[in-house]
Amino acid sequence: MSGRRVLALYAALLFGFAGVLCRLFYLASRTDYAARAAAQSTVTLELPARRGGFYDCMGLPLTGLEKRWLALCFPGQENYTRLYACTDTAGQELLYRSRSRAAPFLVEVDRDMTALGIPCYGASRRYAAAPLCPQLLGYLDGEGHGAAGLEKALDALLTGSGARDTLLCPVTAQGTLRTGEQVQHLQADSGAVGVRLTLSRSVQRAAEAVAAQTMTTGCILVLDVRTAALRACVSVPGFDPADPAASLEAPDSPFLNRALQAYAVGSVFKPVLAAAALEAGLAPEYDCNGAVVVDGQIFRCAGGVPHGEVDLSAALAKSCNGYFIRLGQQLGAQALLQQAQALGFGRSIGLAEGLIAQSGALPGAEELAQSGQLANFSFGQGSLLATPLQVAAMMNTIANGGVYRAPCLLDCALDETSGEELSAFARPQAERVLTEQTAAALHTMLEQTVVEGTAQDASGLPGGAAGKTAMLFGVPAS
């Protein structure tokens, strides 16, 4: 090769290297390219969306009771063994699958491992292993939105904008954390707030324990006498809100809130007739021989057992059907219907949007014009239907001196960080429907029902008790 050609080749190589160097200098001096390169080596992880929680009347949490953490794992770390011992089966499977993963990931653990060099971020399981009032609170769908109960009714409030915190992880090509750099935690304010309910966590837990020991299906309600605020609402059987699909085929309809469903009423309706009689100044005596005949139809007392000479108090305590049939005839259908409506029968009770106690059914005046139907109505039978919540509200009215309040469940929205009340939910208005004298007389009669009547199983309770029992299709209810 001639000297001229060699010189030309060297010149071409020199120009080529010079071009490459100029291009490298250009790229290095461009901040947007540098940022783009950094972004390509930064992994972004989203933390679960923060959802407002439910709290009881004392501010104690009803959801999020089981604290958990999300541990940030980088490939190649030698702490997989420690993480494996601190997570559940799903977390262990995730760790196993991610052994050769070239990117960081999050796994749920049961303790904060930050002090051990593993970054952890606070989280919680929405529902405890022994969940509280699942039919009231409801559950979430696969996207984390309310699908039933209060979770659905208050979803917008609890969710806010849905904005999530993010983690920016500067990584190497192998997915490990770059030397000398740290993970950035970018916090987002979703505006989600908590909701304080009227429930009492301790009373709810106690009621659920009683239900678990004494019933396979049924419900328990506890109301605050003065305000009619729900302190406990138990419906059995229940379900796991963390895994509602597991109960879809379960017997006895566990998703059903029995406290809000309408059923035949039975003898717990008799205080309504007693109230109407006292308001009308009636307290007749009656000689019960165990049965009464109305238009050729025989209505018997329980077991056909005669109660003998009874007044209003004794008839209520012994649950004498014959007495109340005769009393209903004296009072008439209109007076009975008016009294029942005043005490909340025949009207629904709204606890939240979509969470409504059924209105039940009151027979019409035309139906009660038939003497047999009036007789049935007089001791809680026939077409009469009511929810346990309606019956509880009626009894609460007597305990509250004759003042009716519709039961309520929602108290206020609150800031979960400060505990500050943000806005209060509306409460139903109070309405006097019985005189104080009538309420006091009924209260005494219902105490006697416990002391010497059909409700003696409740006698001896600390502080005393008053109440009424019923028998529905052979199944006792109270």
What are the functions of these language-model segments?
Residues 1-245, 337-342:
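Periplasmic/cell-envelope proteins involved in peptidoglycan metabolism and beta-lactam response
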Residues 61-63, 224-267, 275-478:
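Beta-lactam-recognizing serine transpeptidase/beta-lactamase-like catalytic domain environment
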